[in-house]
UniProtKB/Swiss-Prot annotation:
Protein name stated in the entry: Protein ARABIDILLO 2
Location in the cell: Nucleus
Origin superkingdom: Eukaryota
PROSITE patterns: ARM_REPEAT, FBOX
InterPro entries reported in the protein's UniProt record: ARM-like, ARM-type_fold, Armadillo, F-box_dom, Leu-rich_rpt_Cys-con_subtyp, LRR_dom_sf
Gene Ontology cellular component annotations, sorted alphabetically: nucleus
One GO term of the biological process aspect: lateral root development
Length: 928
């Protein structure tokens, strides 16, 4: 099981315009034996224009390729007044190709320095608005060139990430080159000098909205000289000299709104501003620690003034802006948007408030102290974000959705979210709203809404709500998007939803499997986020038997192997290996195990991934090899590709690794050791000492799996002797006596039984007489210790009263009681080969009575009807004619009492089984 939450990350998309040519044929009338075709070129132009406006750029290009008339309409400047290039690779060549369409371009949104450099090549002299994000690398030279080429510019916004390379020099150039500038918002500048601000005051007489956000230093006095300002934001700016600021800002004659959120302002400064500034109507001071220290502070005495702070009710405060506020609607934003008679001045204020609140809430959500504002988020923050998601301003909608995706995250790396916040979003109708945004034709909204849905879906209750509202189909459709950012977030949503067993089949039925596989083929290189999320979702889906077959049918095996072989991104490698592990984990219920092994390069790639420097990659690769080793051909191929050496090396280096890695490397060695040749090779490579060390682990999964590996290895006399010499007997005896896991104790007992069934004695005698005598003494002591522990282990499953009665009775009810008392449920997952079963049947005739009892106890575990492979084991015994030998052993006078009782149960089990299962794989564990 795995999932992932995401916060806002920097990424650049890759854009490719696909322009297929379609033959569009429609039936107009269906008269008998007559069929007429619609002439689509005769559609009214306004209808065609409406179609174009509802499409993204890529789909516009496809539609325009339909015919010459539509190609001409598709190039109309009416459709190219606004461009959002954030999701595309916008470079010089693309700028040149778009230039002829952008003569009348008025608004552009871009992402990153490469796109910024290319803007001037659009030759859009009439450009009015420029908005850019991920601007950390943009320099003064680039920004100055943009300003110089667009003298009609009225709005320039760069952020919310920091513009670290932009200085006051660029601001001066903007002021000089763009005299019509009305709005300027820049984030993260180090210093904003007085000269730069005074240049704005001098050359930009219409400048009414100014924001220097998250800056280090600004000149407070100079800001007081920009007398045209109606709205000023210095949110997040450090080192503000409040005395100087107050003296100058309170005199600004037109200042209506001031945003000082996330600054060091205190209640004294707030009171002075609200009292002294005659024009000021709205003061936003969210997340201001010094202001919030005074718990008794109230702004009620400042009539006609609105204070937005953590301790005020934002909706009530904003209601006072409206003339008729007696009803005070619950959601003032919805009330304002629904007003029939609009007030231009109020609209201007509310639009600014939407922008600054959405920006501040996102910044708070991203900050480390977000958890300290839990009451704020639960009481009004979540509701504010949902309200802002309904804004008419697209950037506000996106920022609110991003904030929603971020504020619920507690720990990104460990996929942990705040359940209270997530459920608050759900209670306020957030799921339905997000899904509506995800259906928008605007790809920016699709991306941010999908991200929020993905993060919220970490919570099981929210995931259920998403599914019930049709969210799975929405995400599956978005995963097919040609916009990489949209597809990436949608894949993340499917990844998180696919954790729930109840959602897996729904995802497959919605076409999610095909969409996820196609993503890997569509973006095989340089799109790490897409690949990791698609592979992660497929890994979760592959854990389900039916869905795993769907993944295979969709070409998932080939896609995942390609990813494991060629991708260099560790996150994608890890998820690809996990997906292959889960595909191979269904044993003989489907053919995926063999299919993965037969895929060219699969086994070799997984062996190579066990040598990755990244622990997660090594862990999942080892897990995949563990499952694949169930297949005889896979097992030998893994060894041929150096799997034994690689896994032994990994085991040797895993002493300080995670328990997950330790378990999987032990499991992979367990699976490979089924083969006698591999078993010997593991011993020769030095695999026994690290496995003994893992047997001593306190983690049940680790020591249980390591004991299983030693069980297989111990059948070889040479390995058995190595286990003795390396102190393995003591480790196994301790495990057999103290582990909480019955399964671990059982396998430790079986390993000890194999070691001391007499075959090792002859092997140990090889060498000089002195060495042989020494070995004999050592073995005798180890044998006594081992047999005593095996006997004690079996006794723990023998209740005196039940066994006393069982020895005298063969009544089914009595034998059922004994069987239930002796049963180890986990042992039902073990699947033995015919030779393995034969070893235990042979052990029934061993001179050692303890080993006879151990063999009978093991055969009981393998044939209990409730066990997964009981029918298979019964079939092996019946086909080999073992029933007669079992009856003879059960009737032998020398057979211990407990062994006789166990054998009665085994014979009864055989009578109830039908020989239907073919011979399968040998002893090992199946895991998902």
């Amino acid at each position: 099981m795995s999932r992932r939450v995401r916060q806002r990350v920097e990424d650049n998309g890759k854009y490719k315009v696909d322009s297929p040519s379609y033959t569009v044929i429609g039936v107009e009338d269906l008269a008998p034996k007559v069929q007429q075709y619609v002439n689509w070129t005769s559609l009214p132009y306004d209808t065609v224009f409406h179609l174009f406006t509802r499409l993204n750029y890529r789909d516009r290009a496809s539609l325009a390729s339909t015919c010459r008339t539509w190609r001409s309409l598709g190039a109309s400047s009416f459709l190219w007044s606004s461009l959002d290039l954030r999701a595309h690779k916008f470079d010089l060549s693309m700028a040149a190709s778009l230039a002829t369409r952008c003569v009348d371009l008025q608004k552009i949104r871009f992402r990153g320095v490469d796109s910024a450099d290319a803007i001037i090549h659009l030759k859009a002299r009439s450009l009015l608005e420029i908005s850019g994000d991920y601007c950390r690398k943009i320099t003064d030279a680039t920004l100055s060139m943009i300003a110089a080429r667009h003298e009609a510019l009225e709005s320039l916004q760069l952020g919310p990430d920091f513009c670290e390379r932009i200085t006051s020099d660029a601001i001066r150039v903007i002021a000089f080159c763009c005299p019509k500038l009305k709005k300027l918002r820049v984030s993260g500048m180090r210093d904003v000098s007085s000269e730069a601000i005074e240049s704005l005051a001098k050359h930009c007489p219409q400048l009414s909205d100014l924001g220097f956000l998250d800056c280090l230093n600004i000149n407070e006095e100079a800001l007081g000289k920009v007398v045209s300002l109606r709205y000023l934001s210095v949110a997040g700016t450090s080192n503000i000299k409040w005395k100087v600021a107050l003296e100058n800002w309170e005199k600004l004659p037109k200042l209506i709104g001031l945003d000082v959120s996330r600054t060091t302002i205190d209640h004294i400064a707030v009171s002075r501003l609200l009292k002294s500034s005659q024009s000021l109507k709205v003061l936003c001071a969210l997340n201001c620690p010094y202001l919030e220290e005074d718990k008794s502070y109230s702004s009620n005495r400042f009539k006609g003034k609105v204070l937005l702070a953590v301790f005020t009710d934002t909706f009530d405060e904003l209601a006072s802006i409206f003339a008729d506020n007696s009803k005070k609607p619950k959601n003032i934003f919805s009330y304002w948007r629904d007003l029939i008679r609009k007030d231009k001045s109020i609209d201007e204020i509310m639009l600014w408030i939407e922008w600054i609140i959405s920006h501040t809430l996102l910044r708070i959500a991203e900050s480390s102290n977000s958890q300290g504002l839990n009451d704020f988020w639960l009481n009004q923050g979540a509701t504010l974000l949902l309200s802002l998601m309904q804004s008419a301003q697209e950037d506000v909608q996106e920022r609110a959705a991003t904030g929603l995706a971020t504020f619920i995250v507690v720990d990104d790396e460990n996929a942990s979210i705040d359940c209270g916040r997530a459920e608050a979003v759900m209670r306020d109708g957030g799921i339905r709203l997000l899904l509506e945004l995800a259906k928008s034709w605007r790809e920016g909204l699709q991306s941010e809404a999908a991200k929020a849905i993905a993060n919220l879906s970490v919570n099981a209750k929210v995931a259920k709500a998403v599914a019930e509202e049709g969210g799975i189909s929405v995400l599956a459709d978005l995963a097919k998007s040609m916009n990489r950012l949209v597809a990436e977030e949608a894949a993340g949503g499917l990844w998180n939803l696919s954790v729930g067993e109840e959602h897996k089949n729904a995802i497959a039925q919605a076409g999610g499997v095909n969409a996820l596989v196609d993503l890997i083929f569509r973006w095989p290189h340089g799109c790490d986020g897409v690949l990791e999320r698609a592979a992660g979702a497929l890994a979760n889906l592959a854990a389900d038997d039916k869905c795993s077959m769907e993944v295979a049918r969709a070409g998932g095996v080939h896609a995942l192997v390609m990813l494991a072989r060629n991708c260099k991104y560790e996150g994608a490698q890890e998820q690809a290996a996990r997906a292959l592990a889960n595909l191979a984990a269904h044993g003989d219920s489907n053919g995926n195990n063999a299919a993965v092994g037969q895929e060219a390069g699969a086994l070799e790639a997984l062996v190579q991934l066990t040598q990755s420097p990244h622990e997660g990659v090594k862990q999942e690769a080892a897990g995949a090899l563990w499952n694949l080793a169930f297949d005889d051909k896979n097992r030998e191929s893994i060894a041929a590709f150096g799997g034994v050496e690689a896994l032994v090396a990994l085991a040797k280096s895993s002493s300080n690794a995670s328990t997950g890695l330790q378990e999987r490397v032990a499991g992979a060695l367990w699976g490979l050791s089924v083969s006698e040749a591999n078993s010997i090779a593991i011993g020769h490579e030095g695999g026994i000492p690290p496995l003994i060390a893992l047997v001593r682990s306190e983690a049940e999964d680790v020591h249980e799996t390591a004991a299983g590996a030693l069980w297989n290895l111990s059948f070889n006399p040479g390995n058995a002797l190595r286990i003795v010499e390396e102190g393995g007997v003591v480790a196994l005896v301790q495990l057999c006596s103290s582990s909480v896991s019955k399964m671990a104790r059982f396998m430790a007992a079986l390993a000890l039984a194999y070691m001391f069934d007499g075959r090792m004695d002859e092997y140990a005698m090889i060498g000089t007489s002195l060495e042989s005598t020494s070995k004999s003494v050592t073995l005798n002591g180890a044998r006594t210790m081992a047999l005593d522990q095996i006997k004690a282990f079996i006794k723990t499953f023998m209740e005196h009263q039940i066994f006393s009665t069982g020895a005298l009775s063969s009544a089914p009810s009595m034998l059922a009681q004994v069987s239930e008392r002796a049963r180890i449920p986990e042992a039902g997952h073990l699947r033995c080969s015919g030779s393995e079963i034969g070893r235990f049947v042979t052990m029934l005739r061993n001179p050692c009575l303890v080993l006879r009892a151990c063999a009978a106890f093991a055969l009981l575990q393998f044939t209990i009807p409730e066990s997964r492979h009981a029918m298979h084991h019964a079939s092996l015994m019946q086909n080999a004619g073992e029933a007669r030998g079992l009856r003879s052993a059960a009737a032998a006078a020398s057979m211990p009492r407990e062994a006789k009782i166990f054998m009665k149960i085994v014979l009864r089990n055989l009578e109830h089984q039908q020989a239907e299962s073919p011979e399968g794989m040998k002893v090992s564990y199946n895991r998902i």
